[in-house]
Amino acid sequence: MERSSTVAVAYDCLFPFTTGGGERQYRATAEVLGDLGFDVDYLTSRQWDGETPTEGLFRILPITPRLSLYSADGVRRIPAALRYAAGLFGALVRRRRRYAAVIVSGLPIFNVFAARLALLGSGTKLVVDYLEVWHRRQWIEYSGTVTGTIAWVLQRAAIAITPLATCHSQLSATRLLREGLRCEPLVSPGLIDGAVEVAPPASAATPPYVLYAGRHIPDKRVDVLPAAIAAARENIPDLRLVILGTGPSSEAVRAEVHRVGGESWTDFPGFVSESELDRLLHGALALANPSRREGYGLVVVEANAHGTPVVLVADEGNAATELIESDVNGVVSPTTRPADLARAIRDVADGGDDLRRSSRAWYDTAVGTRTIRRTVEGILSALPLPSPATVKTKEDSP
């Protein structure tokens, strides 16, 4: 394949072997590039047993063995990040003149140094995608004073050597410039991976329930939900809480459920199938995500596709709030205090079917303008790259 039509996407995780917003985003990016006719390599760590899986629109290249990415506390492990960065450096050095462009995740931050050094003098264009940008205090809260300060310094250094940065919120764009980016970042229009086929919006299930779907880690603040639901039940007596996922904070969440006497109205299904997740999303009164930090907020989009409004919490690190239009597709609570969150949940309940219809209408508009395809097209325009001669489509792929 000619260099001009070969692109690499580099991230240490790949959906569906690991799940999360970044995994979905980078897989979809590779698929869109392949759909546009580019020859695409996905450089990742091994996350499967047996032979490397094959994909129709991109090629999976494992560049490291299986890695233990997170500690027991849900924090990214530095040894794993360094191991992947070393694998990325070696893979790009060996292929430095194969690729017209490399799109690499800026998290973990070591990826940026590995890719920049490996591609020096090659003529390959480098795009660094920043899922999130943290200030110093966030790094210290996440990793401790010493490690957090070092991580923040490394982040600033990586941003300074980034030739083209992409991000997915005005919050991240502002932080990139504040942390030393030397050119204007490319802010994506959105990360929707095409329209999803779901039933038209319907009334919330009876009895009503608030849904949380995600990892249980301190930054997600799942443990604030039981007290909020207990407060909301003063006005909505049959309200329930359904908490999906697991993680290091699960015991703290269960302890809060016990503290507020919520055992009879709280369910912990753990991880569920895609079909069950769709069913729960479709029937939820609201999807609540009290996270203090989000780089984009794909959960808003996924819930609104089902006509389900979203309850978020205002925080300086939560870019998901940029997607919320008050009384259209959700409510932003000013704090995590039970009274404030309960008020937001009651506002959603008061919005009834009208709010559910407007949430779906928001999604229908967004799916035409806020897609990963539009984001990829913006990257290609900014580089720019020669258009590949032959365009593949999903229908043409095996």
Question: Across the structure, where does each feature detected by a protein language model lie?
Answer:
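Membrane-proximal helix-turn-helix segments that form the acceptor-binding/catalytic region
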Residues: F110-F113, L117-G121, T145-A165
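Conserved donor-binding/catalytic core segment of Leloir-type glycosyltransferases
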Residues: T166, A202-I229, V242
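Nucleotide-activated donor-binding/catalytic signature segment of Leloir-type glycosyltransferases, i.e.
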Residues: R254-V272
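Short alpha-helical donor nucleotide-sugar binding micro-motif in glycosyltransferases
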Residues: F271-V272, R279-A284
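Aromatic "clamp/platform" in nucleotide-sugar-dependent glycosyltransferases that forms part
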Residues: R292
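Short hydrophobic beta-strand element within catalytic cores of glycosyltransferases
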Residues: P309-A314
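Conserved acidic donor-binding segment of nucleotide-sugar-dependent glycosyltransferases
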Residues: E325-P338, R346-G352
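A charged, aromatic-enriched C-terminal amphipathic alpha-helix characteristic of glycosyltransferases
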Residues: T336, D350-L383
